[in-house]
């Protein structure tokens, strides 16, 4: 079983080293590159203000987040959901930095960079020089964006799961892996018995008729020098 976890965060800003915090985290389980329906989602009280420019991106204000769990309250569940899976994110370095900062505040181990799969890097390799934001990729792959009014970690995970499948080979990739299993009936065809091949040879009359037809041909190609 190939298990990956695709995840996304929303934050109060762009730099955890300047005190920006995670306000939302969502994760979605993939097995053989297809969603299983299992997911993790939490809104988080950042224990600080939410700048207006950040609110314009994700729609959350400090009032929305007051009383929500603190990151310390959800960290254990998130780590358990991640387990030892490969971790997929769009512009993954950004999300890794923020989670590492949150884990570091709690004295927890940071994420192993070797587990990172960055869909932005995959997209840039496949579509060099083209826009490769999540919105741009959804439009390129004809993925419905009608519900994406603001950035929302859980919805973005669901959209990114569809984008990821397209980036690694399209909807059929993983489908075969998911549908063929131990219970799938397999038909095996074997040859039954032996078969004698009949060789048909022309009779004297048929040979004579064929020769007569050849003599009526004008300038046959095989007679040319």
Predicted regions and their residues:
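Active-site catalytic microenvironments for nucleophilic, acid-base chemistry
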Residues: 102-105, 163-170
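Conserved non-catalytic scaffold segment of RNase H-like nuclease domains
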Residues: 1-114, 124-128, 136-151, 224
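Acidic, divalent-metal-coordinating active-site segment for phosphoryl/phosphodiester hydrolysis
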Residues: 152-167
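Short, flexible loop segments at boundaries between secondary-structure elements
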Residues: 118-124, 183-187
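Acidic two-metal-ion nuclease catalytic site recognized across multiple nuclease folds
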Residues: 166-225
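Generic alpha-helical structural context detector
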Residues: 121-124, 139, 162-165
């Amino acid at each position: 079983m190939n298990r990956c976890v695709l995840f996304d965060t929303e934050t109060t800003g762009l730099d955890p080293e300047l005190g920006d915090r995670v306000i939302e985290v969502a994760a979605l389980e993939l097995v053989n590159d297809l969603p299983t329906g299992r997911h993790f989602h939490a809104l988080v009280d950042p224990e600080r203000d939410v700048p207006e420019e950040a609110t314009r991106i994700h729609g959350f204000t400090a009032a929305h987040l007051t009383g929500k769990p603190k990151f310390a309250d959800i960290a254990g569940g998130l780590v358990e959901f991640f387990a030892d899976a490969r971790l997929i994110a769009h512009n993954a370095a950004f999300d890794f930095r923020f989670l590492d900062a949150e884990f570091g505040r709690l004295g927890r181990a940071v994420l192993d960079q070797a587990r990172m799969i960055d869909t932005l890097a995959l997209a840039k390799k496949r579509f060099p020089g083209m826009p490769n934001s999540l919105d741009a990729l959804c439009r390129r792959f004809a993925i419905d964006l009608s519900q994406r009014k603001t950035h929302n970690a859980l919805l973005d995970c669901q959209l990114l799961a569809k984008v990821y499948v397209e980036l690694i080979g399209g909807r059929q990739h993983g489908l075969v892996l998911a549908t063929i299993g131990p219970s799938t009936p397999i038909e095996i065809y074997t040859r039954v018995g032996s078969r004698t091949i009949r060789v048909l040879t022309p009779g004297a009359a048929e040979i004579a008729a064929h020769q007569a037809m050849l003599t009526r041909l004008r300038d046959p190609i095989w007679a040319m020098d």
